[in-house]
């Protein structure tokens, strides 16, 4: 302790000496200004400027000295009326957000002229619960203004100005200028008990937005395949996350329901089922119908001409051709919906056909505005890069429209009719350049206004265990239905291997099979960074150890079983808490470690929504499960005697178990997994 006092004294003395020298220099400058000729304007201006800088530096140093002398004293009372400390029944408090605002108050009071430095408060495990890491940045900002203040002095000044808030138990300077923060366990307990009483609430959102999420997008008359898997799973999870945060989300399925392929399908339908207008044709196997029509289209020139003729008649909305088109679309929709029902996906269909009239209205406006250029018979549109890269092809040389045209019309519809504040496209990473150009063109012509956020959420390829593109043994694309069926079969084998059929009813076993099957497929995708390719392996995803859905689902069911073993229902636990007969236990270090992990739920969601990287939410879920295991191994919730009779129930710990289950259930829900109470 004596060494620390001596160090502070030495620093204070050095700072005092520098202050005296600065005072002398200021006085000398005053004299120079006084003695200079009135005509020497440039010199006078320079001297005044230097004088102002020295005065500023003097004031900073005085504050630093005062801070150094008072760093171990009690923090001053400061107004924190703007900090989010008041509990809101609609939101779960974010400790990181509160600390960021509290430290922001302290920084602005300590260094009011430094306003362009981010306030960094991050979770910490080694040196406290959180750590303030902006002192170095503030020191650098001061140095740029000609003021030299060491980061440690900056940190001390900030700590001295920290508002007194019930959240912060202790804040102390360490190392070269870090501030380690310990939060109040009582404050943390109050947040977690609110979760028990009111359910898991979202963090505070400063602005609720209307968000359009475009995902899945299969093609009519073709089966969904593994290539649609990532878009569907990622898009659904993003939608769930944004809905939980309070945004108004519109899920759009931009299906391919228009184009040349319908000409050949209709022509083949007419030949194969000539009575299709009066008798509904048995075309459940659209994939076979498509293959047959495609083969004829490629090999038979007369059939090809008929197909093109059918396209023209369809585009002219001739009733017989519209009915044939609707028949084909309806069959496809039913097949798509079977997959969506199994995976718990909700979507509003908005196909290519929806935008036909909008494209017809859009193209003349783009031409009239001078945004299109003629290129070898085509009409193209360049982005903001002045003719570099690849332009959008808005009109083909034959006068037809393209996917680029429909994408532009689609974007306009979402801004002007859906009134979207944020538009998200979930497609493979290979389309990144296309969307970059699309967004540039849309901004250039005024379709995409300032203030509307657009994101292309790209993802990598699904690989087989041979690290090549995922295919069947015969080299064909893997059908999504077949993949789901295989998942159910393998999950059943896994459950029977563990003899779960002996303890679960038939309905419970079926629910467990589907929970594991669809959960492991989704989680294996979401737990990987979406920007990377990932290897699809049932063997790995069905393992019950490590960061897998199986491990997490088992962990959840075990947590749910603890209260049941103690004979306590959720209603009884909430009553005990609300009536003051029990409180959530956070005294043991393992209890507090789990509690801190659960308290980070709001900040994890806030981080995920910034870059829509859902693997971070999966990592957090796995952290909860492993931290719970540490707690459960160290802290007895139920104590039994040698005969297995319950001797003691630690209600405070069971309350902590219940909060853990609630938070895990909410994360499962956002990820689209369906846990079951018994497995």
Per-region residue spans from a language model:
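Non-catalytic interaction-recognition regions
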Residues: 2-189, 196-679
